[in-house]
């Protein structure tokens, strides 16, 4: 990985296309060194990391920058990590993409509230122009690119930003996740240009000579019970009433719950979804408020109808998804995963951590538990979303 003196010592013939790393040390000096050691064999063009909020973030920034030198580094805080060992908490994980098989452009977006389609057009156009000058793929570059977003998970601006980017990207797929803060819901941050930022987003455009597939799935099945959103707090992702009754009380009623039982775990095990066309999209609840309103992780409008959902088997469904991805791509060298915090709550509740970790290890996943997932122009909840990257095309550089 990293400084040029080390990079030039790596033989291109044997340098891997990708590398993965993780550390459970909360000492930023130790953690950064362990990340560096695991990624050093990859002649990296970029490094992406996800970390818990227990780290002293300023010191972690300095340590990572010291090891990475002029390599592009982006990242964010998380609500749980998927490391080379599997599901973890209070840790850091990372992956590196090699300059032999990847070319990347990164950008920090700070003006989330005013970010427009014009801004997105200018940003994407400039990034594509730069990538064309150093493409690693054959043929039209747009057919060998994907976009990746990391967004402040408390900004309430994900929909605006990803919709603008998606329109500008046209046929280039876009995937990403909303940063977490270990479920404190106080301060989520993204990392770019050597430091952490709040109220911001990071966008990375990736050109690759490797096969890849962008995906997004959920494992939930509909039940009969419905809730109509009858009153909201505009622009706040807060539902005040279902069926003209206090939202929390109606939610409890259809799920057979008591008000005092409501928690993140309960919300994870009793999700709701909105139907758009033939598809059901989950609308996850973040928390119950003192006035009996409910705060959601996604935008939600008055008049929509929500359906009660139940798990159809998280482990079995994830295994099916990963097996199908592997059948289409062959061996997966890296799976960049954005795994909703409510999936993690279900994993913990049902004691699935080791079995899910085994699945993630077998498919070379690096990722984090998010406050929301993005796929193309959609901001989602309760999904397993990401990019599966296969082996390089041997006929290409």
Language-model segments: which ranges?
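Hydrophobic alpha/beta core scaffold segments
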Residues: 2-397
């Amino acid at each position: 990985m990293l400084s040029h003196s080390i990079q030039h010592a790596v033989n291109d013939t044997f340098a891997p296309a990708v590398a993965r790393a993780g550390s459970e040390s909360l000492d930023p000096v130790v953690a950064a060194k362990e990340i560096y050691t695991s990624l050093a064999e990859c002649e990296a063009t970029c490094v992406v990391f996800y970390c818990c909020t227990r780290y002293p973030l300023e010191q972690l920034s300095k340590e990572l920058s010291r090891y990475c030198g002029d390599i592009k580094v982006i990242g964010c805080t998380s609500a749980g990590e998927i490391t080379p060992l599997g599901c973890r908490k209070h840790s850091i994980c990372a992956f590196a993409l090699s300059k032999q098989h990847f070319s990347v452009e990164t950008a920090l977006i700070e003006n989330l509230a005013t970010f427009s389609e014009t801004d997105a057009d200018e940003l994407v156009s400039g990034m594509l122009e730069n990538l064309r000058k150093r493409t690693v793929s054959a043929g039209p570059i747009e057919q060998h690119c994907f976009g990746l977003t990391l967004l402040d998970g408390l900004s309430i601006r994900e929909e605006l930003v990803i919709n603008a980017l998606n329109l500008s990207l046209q046929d280039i797929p876009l995937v990403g996740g909303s940063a977490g803060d270990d479920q404190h819901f106080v301060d989520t941050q993204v990392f770019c240009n050597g430091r952490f930022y709040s109220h911001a987003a990071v966008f990375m455009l990736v050109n690759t000579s490797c096969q890849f597939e962008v995906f997004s799935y959920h494992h939930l099945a509909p039940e009969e019970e419905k809730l109509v959103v009858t009153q909201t707090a505009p622009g706040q992702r807060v539902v005040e009433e279902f069926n003209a009754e206090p939202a929390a009380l109606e939610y409890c009623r259809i799920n057979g719950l008591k008000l005092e039982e409501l928690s993140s775990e309960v919300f994870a095990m009793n999700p709701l979804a909105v139907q758009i066309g033939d598809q059901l999209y989950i609308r996850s609840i973040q928390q119950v408020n003192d006035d009996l309103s409910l705060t959601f992780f996604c935008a939600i409008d008055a008049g929509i109808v929500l359906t009660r959902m139940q798990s159809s088997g998280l482990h079995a469904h994830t295994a099916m998804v990963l097996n199908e991805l592997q059948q289409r791509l062959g061996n997966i060298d890296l799976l960049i995963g954005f795994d909703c915090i409510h999936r993690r709550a279900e994993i913990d509740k049902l004691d699935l951590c080791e079995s899910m970790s085994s699945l993630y290890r077998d498919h070379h996943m690096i990722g984090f538990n998010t406050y929301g997932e993005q796929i193309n122009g959609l901001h989602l909840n309760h999904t397993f979303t990401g990019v599966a990257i296969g082996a390089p095309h041997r006929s290409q550089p």
